[in-house]
From Swiss-Prot:
GO terms for cellular component: cytosol. PROSITE patterns: RECA_1 (PS00321), RECA_2 (PS50162), RECA_3 (PS50163). Residues 329-377 are annotated as: Disordered. ATP binds at residues 65-72. Belongs to the RecA family. It comes from Levilactobacillus brevis (strain ATCC 367 / BCRC 12310 / CIP 105137 / JCM 1170 / LMG 11437 / NCIMB 947 / NCTC 947). GO terms for biological process: DNA recombination; DNA repair; SOS response. Residues 339-361 have a biased composition (Basic and acidic residues). SMART domains: AAA. This is Protein RecA. It comes from the Bacteria. One of its GO terms (molecular function) is single-stranded DNA binding.
């Protein structure tokens, strides 16, 4: 009986492969690439919170939060990390608000960044589809879902009712995009705003525009919120920002990362490194004093951050120990291997797809000392 069932299964598998092509069905264990390929987020703390060392390739990521919370900053750091590893990035600026000078300050190479400022939501999503389908793009950022206005609303009169148009647009687009995103290993990063649901008496009244489709299709959803202001005397020089992993299909969710977003500098590498080093007892905190080994590195967090920034050798040593403690890879080695992988990539019809052993760089997270938007979008 078992032999008959196996023979019937083998016959069905052969027919499926004949009808739909080789590789249309396979045993999961036969797939040599079982590890999740990732690209670092640009924040070591966020890489750890994500559980896999960064944003997963071939998946959809949503970043949402209140105004000026740092959503665009987080997205631009991801773009900078992709470019740092030799990848190609595209930015669909539906809000028409991207600041090239700020993007440059965060480490984005604006000469190589592909930018589109679409007139309608349909146009923006069609452009994203064309870019992703090319197989030559590593990350596409859509800023933002709320600004993807359907053509009917653009061409209509002010005050006209267009119930559910944007939700239908997003649902249709994501049905089409999800398969292509997975095949091309592109990261599709959607920035979203928040709205208040009317009449909610109990529970959280906040929701995100664009319907429910994005919530379902997203592998990772990040909630970005300002926690407190960072001051130098009476001057506000940045924000302490909490990033919560609300949804995660590739690792346990609900982890948090706290980062300093400094005006004009972005996510502070020294700030998160200091916090993580204290958490793992690599740096000792006694009262307001911070010490590393026999060296006192500062009284107060801001002074300790500045000391690390002024002593790159010590910072590199602390960075290495923190990465080892959290089980994430070395940044410089990752960038080097990524460049080698890009050079050695296969040239045949599977161009753009590399084996797991050829892409260790994209599985290890890295950091870059960068910066928040001046309005901390």
């Amino acid at each position: 009986m078992a032999d008959e069932r196996q023979a019937a299964l083998d016959k069905a598998l052969k027919k499926i492969e004949k009808d739909f092509g080789k590789g249309s069905i396979m045993r999961l264990g036969d797939n040599s690439n079982l590890e999740v390929e990732t690209v670092p987020s640009g924040s070591l703390a966020l890489d750890v919170a994500l559980g896999v060392g960064g944003y997963p390739r071939g998946r959809i990521v949503e970043i949402y939060g209140p105004e000026s919370s740092g959503k665009t900053t987080v997205a631009l750091h991801a773009v900078a990390e992709v470019q740092k590893r030799g990848g190609t990035a595209a930015y669909i600026d539906a809000e028409n608000a991207l600041d090239p000078a700020y993007a440059t300050a965060l480490g984005v190479n604006i000469d190589d960044l592909l930018l589109s400022q679409p007139d309608t939501g349909e146009q923006g999503l069609q452009i994203a589809d064309a870019l992703i389908s090319s197989g030559a793009i590593d990350i596409v950022v859509v800023d933002s879902v709320a600004a993807l206005v359907p053509r009917a609303e653009i061409e209509g009169e002010m005050g006209d009712a267009h119930v559910g148009l944007q939700a239908r647009l997003m649902s249709q687009a994501l049905r089409k995009l999800s398969g292509t995103i997975n095949k091309t290993k592109t990261i599709a990063l959607f920035i979203n705003q928040i709205r208040e649901k009317v009449g909610v008496m109990f529970g959280n009244p906040e929701t995100t525009p664009g319907g429910r489709a994005l919530k379902f299709y997203a592998t990772v959803r990040l909630e970005v919120r300002r926690a407190e202001q960072i001051k130098d005397g009476t001057d506000v020089i940045g924000n302490r920002t909490r990033i919560k992993v609300v949804k995660n299909k590739v690792a346990p969710p609900f982890k948090r990362a706290e980062v300093d977003i400094m005006y004009g500098q972005g996510i502070s590498q020294t700030g998160e490194l200091l916090d993580m080093a204290v958490e793992k007892d690599i740096v000792d905190k006694s009262g307001s004093w911070y010490s590393y080994g026999e060296d006192r590195i500062g009284q107060g967090r801001e002074n300790a951050k500045q000391y690390l920034a002024d002593h790159p050798d010590m910072m590199a040593e602390v960075n290495q120990r923190v990465r080892a403690a959290y089980g994430v890879g070395d940044e410089e080695a990752a960038a080097t291997k990524a460049t080698e992988t890009k050079t050695d990539a296969p040239k045949d019809k599977d161009k753009g797809k590399t084996k797991a052993k050829d892409k260790p760089a994209d599985v290890t997270p890295g950091q870059i000392e960068l910066a928040p938007d001046k309005s901390a979008k």
